[in-house]
Amino acid sequence: MSTSEFVLAQSATVPAPDIEYGQLSPMLIVFGVAVAGVLVEAFLPRRGRYSSHLVLALGGLTAAFVAVVLLAGTRDSVVGGAVAVDGPTLFLQGTILLISIPAILIIAERSVDSGVAAATAEVTAVRGAEPEGGTDAFTPQAFAVPGSVAEREATRNAPGHTEVFPLTLFAVGGMLLFPASNDLLTMFVALEVLSLPLYLLCGLARRRRLLSQEAALKYFLLGAFSSAFFLFGVALLYGYAGTVALPGIADALARGTEDRTLALIGTALLSVGLLFKIGAVPFHSWIPDVYQGAPTPITAFMAAATKVAAVGAMLRIFYVALPDLRADWRPVMWGVAILTMVVGAVMAVTQNDVKRMLAYSSVAHAGFILTGLVAANRAGLSSTMFYLLAYGFSTLGAFAVVTLVRDSRGEATDLSRWAGLGRRSPLVGGVFALFLLAFAGIPLTSGFVSKFAVFQAALEGGAVPLVLVGVVSSAIAAFFYVRVIVLMFFSEPQSDAPTIVVPSMFTAAAIAVGVVVTVVLGILPQGALDLADQAAVFFR
């Protein structure tokens, strides 16, 4: 072999990357269980799929959370620097997994929809059927035309659409990777992995099929559009810095030897993709339609977990890659946060549908969360992570309650139908009132502590006007929350009042978890606040 051939042979050798499987174990477990779920769909008889999926999903999520706990204190970057394992990553991954476990229970519920038939017989409480014998919230055949013979035949032949379990787990895996991504290409892959299953899941509602399919189509088209903005921003930042690694972009900006116009435009486009996922104004138009049309268990999962993942990714980009552009992005985020809080609160007042009201409430909360990001200090980071934890469980519980109020068409989400609900079922009305009070930020609930924490961090960061707007928006939001409580407890029930379904232990457990977390974080929040503060250091 000649010298040139030897050199060529050496240069053609590509070293295998070092993959730290232990530090990636939470994500690997979830993705592994998701793949196993696909195999269950392919090889197990239909009758055994439901229970197998449920055991796999709950076991996998629990194992992944244990892996997160075992990684506590780790500060490192793995897979060639593409993934960061640090305090914010582990805190947010733990939050996503803890939210996903009760979300799976709500998705697995099969007794609630069985109460619809009983609703036409004016039954006020329906005992749940066994999960294997009942029906879930998902259509058994997604491609069938709504109301067609094929759909009715599929409903008779199949009890449910068990593919929702692996789809949900793939979305969870993408959510775990999203806030951990330490370069922009990995972040884009995570964004698509979490988004694609959600596009499908939004269109699988058993009831109100056309509304569900419309929601899925809107979410897909607008989501693809926002992903294009994100990818274009990645290209421009790469053009400026010569790297997609977040620390590398920060180093290029710190040197400051070139015109930053390319970096500023790239940051703006990148922000569009992230603000869309968060549901911030003016990129919020999809939120009310998708939240209303999607199956309510999926709405609950999206509203809680997706926001955690998207905010985590946004925190990493702005705190790790773009600290030297703080003077440029902070004023813009001020404006976005103010618009989001005000528009979300005002629009929620005008809604007559419970799910749309909660959707605009989610928009307003995105503004409160951005207040912590705008603080641009450690207190802002820790308070934002605490807010995501508190908000996630309250949101999950609130949407779980919505699944229990039903009539012959499915969920009775028209607000007028909730009149007297608290009188007919004090427990259901009281639980929903608790979640609404938490959203309003009333003391002794997690919502009060989380809002106080982000406002205090913003004050430390000099964002006094932003805090004033936040307080006013909270007051506006409190009006429509209290309006619903008054409607439930101080109004006469309608003659054709909806059925209040007694769920199986799955939904009951999910609601109970939401109640416990909302109350405990409101009365004894210090442990979670300290944990968030200890985790509030990014690995660079």
Swiss-Prot record:
User: Is Nucleotidyltransferase among the key words of this record?
Assistant: no
Question: Top enzyme class of this protein?
Answer: translocase
Task: Cite a single Pfam family from the UniProt record.
Answer: Proton_antipo_M
GO terms for biological process? ATP synthesis coupled electron transport
* Localization per Swiss-Prot or TrEMBL: Cell membrane
EC numbers listed for it are 7.1.1.-
Q: Which UniProt keywords apply?
A: Cell membrane, Membrane, NAD, Quinone, Translocase, Transmembrane, Transmembrane helix, Transport
What Gene Ontology cellular component terms go with this record?
plasma membrane
A GO MF term: NADH dehydrogenase (ubiquinone) activity
Record's bilayer topology term: Multi-pass membrane protein
Domain of life of the organism encoding this protein: Bacteria
Q: Where are the transmembrane segments?
A: 24-44, 54-74, 88-108, 158-178, 184-204, 219-239, 263-283, 295-315, 331-351, 357-377, 385-405, 428-448, 462-482, 505-525
Keyword Membrane (UniProt): yes
Q: Which reaction does it catalyse?
A: a quinone + NADH + 5 H(+)(in) = a quinol + NAD(+) + 4 H(+)(out)
The subunit field of the Swiss-Prot or TrEMBL record says: NDH-1 is composed of 14 different subunits. Subunits NuoA, H, J, K, L, M, N constitute the membrane sector of the complex.
Similarity comment:
Belongs to the complex I subunit 2 family.
Job of this protein: NDH-1 shuttles electrons from NADH, via FMN and iron-sulfur (Fe-S) centers, to quinones in the respiratory chain. The immediate electron acceptor for the enzyme in this species is believed to be a menaquinone. Couples the redox reaction to proton translocation (for every two electrons transferred, four hydrogen ions are translocated across the cytoplasmic membrane), and thus conserves the redox energy in a proton gradient.
Name of this protein: NADH-quinone oxidoreductase subunit N
Q: Which organism's genome codes for this protein?
A: Rhodococcus opacus (strain B4)
Q: Which gene encodes it?
A: nuoN
